[in-house]
Amino acid sequence: MSEQQPKAKFSDNERLKGESRFLRGTIAQDLQDGLTGGFNGDNFQLIRFHGMYQQDDRDLRAERAEEKLEPLINMMLRCRLPGGVITPQQWLGIDAFAAEQTLYGSIRLTTRQTFQFHGVLKPKLKGMHQLLHCLGLDSIATAGDVNRNVLCTSNPVESVLHRQAWEWAKKISEHLLPKTRAYAEIWLDGEKTETTDQEPILGPTYLPRKFKTTVVVPPLNDVDLHANDLNFVAISDNGQLVGFNVLVGGGLAMTHGDKSTYPRKASEFGFIALDDTLKIAEAVVTTQRDWGNRSNRKNAKTKYTLESEGVGAFREEVEVRAGVQFAPIRPYAFTERGDRFGWVKGIDNQWHLTLFIENGRILDYPDRTLKTGLAEIARRHKGDFRLTANQNLIIAGVDKKDKAAIEALARRHGLINDDATPQRKASMACVAFPTCPLAMAEAERFLPQFVSNVETIMSGHGLAEDEIILRVTGCSNGCGRAMLAEIGLVGKAIGRYNLYLGGDRIGTRIPRIYRENITEDEILSIIDDTAGRWARERQPQESYGDYLVRAGIVRPVVDSARDFYD
């Protein structure tokens, strides 16, 4: 097919990217404008390519409007952290910045296996980027129409294989980064050169839409590969990485009321040798760059390109561009996707402690000084921290002689909670209110008490030691990955959600809508009824989602492009 569509049809985002001078826009000038706390015009969108979103505190909107003040505009920054690995020294740097320079004082672990700062005012932005640079970090391409933070299976049980997978996650991230010098010029006072920027992979208008990549090590699907555009499934031989199965075209975002949008599982393309990894990654990205829909952003992601052009045609184009033929998919299987909490011994004789961080929000609470505790551990720990795609944190690489001291610190500060149930650990939410401008309903602030109510139901049916994969997302964009949950709540309005049921425990089946626009009480009543039936009628080891499908309570989504709305 032709590589270009008629220019008149392009969305306005294509115009602003093309006119941005390789993502510079007039961001530097806006930084000097003290009359507003935000960025104007195109810059509002362009700062996303630099890893930031412009937000405001929605709890304060009405009050500030009454006082004739503009909203409390602030920025959220998402760090680029391939595979979620961060050193204790880096952690201490971000800990201090969050405490001293942000409105909320917290560090937010996210489903993109990195951390976010929320509530950064415009005068603090340059110092924030320069701090990250000094720490060896950045936020390049963690938002916008680019390849975003690359996820990698984070549990280091198989340390050699995990290390190899993580090295490839870093290589893929670096290879697909924008080449523009705009970030360094604007935020790091980098030298402006006369050399014209080139973007050989992403192109002068970058990608049609955001693009997400994972490296996953079976049997753990902790990264939820089917939520991502490009996935490399590690294939090993005698514990050594030998290549990847490649899956393309996953994604969960949709638009309420628009049946041309839907979640989609990734399609299997085939197996590749390690040496072909970067060639295939580049070929998938450039094919999506040239074939993706640049006129309608709601249908611009890779999943829609595969449906419009055909999986076979897309796959063949990737082979041509890469000069690589896909071999048949090699056997792989997933058995779980949750994090393995507590101490796990690696094959290197070091120990790894996975901590449950509810909602990923690291802050000092009256009964749990999580932020202080992690800072104290960082001052003592000789290994690293690994953030997980489930919003939790691993203290990795602990010597046996240091285990007791690390655990004592974690317990003292409430980082280890023996009372946290399997259900609570299997539940997750996106940020939503008060900072996300897209949120239609609560998610992070709603989840803890909602889970308590679900726990009561589970206990009443003799299910206290069981779990249901439960996800809450504040809008249909899907950051909480509700469209791969056994129970998925998608915000519709304040206090109301669409309820999806019937996903599976390992993240390989999309749930189906069960009730639309219902209240918390209605949702809990449905969970009470279906969990009770599950307890009475399930087969040995049968999960909640699998039971719902077998019992005919929901029909499975088999081919979401065709049957998601049936």
Curated annotation (Swiss-Prot):
SUPFAM superfamilies: Nitrite and sulphite reductase 4Fe-4S domain-like (SSF56014), Nitrite/Sulfite reductase N-terminal domain-like (SSF55124). Pathway: Sulfur metabolism; hydrogen sulfide biosynthesis; hydrogen sulfide from sulfite (NADPH route): step 1/1. Its cofactor is siroheme; [4Fe-4S] cluster. Binds 1 siroheme per subunit. GO terms for molecular function: 4 iron, 4 sulfur cluster binding; heme binding; metal ion binding; NADP binding; sulfite reductase (ferredoxin) activity; sulfite reductase (NADPH) activity. PROSITE patterns: NIR_SIR. The keyword Nucleotide-binding does not apply. The keyword Iron-sulfur applies. [4Fe-4S] cluster binds at C430, C436, C475, C479. Alpha(8)-beta(8). The alpha component is a flavoprotein, the beta component is a hemoprotein. Component of the sulfite reductase complex that catalyzes the 6-electron reduction of sulfite to sulfide. This is one of several activities required for the biosynthesis of L-cysteine from sulfate. This is Sulfite reductase [NADPH] hemoprotein beta-component. It comes from Sodalis glossinidius (strain morsitans). The gene is cysI.
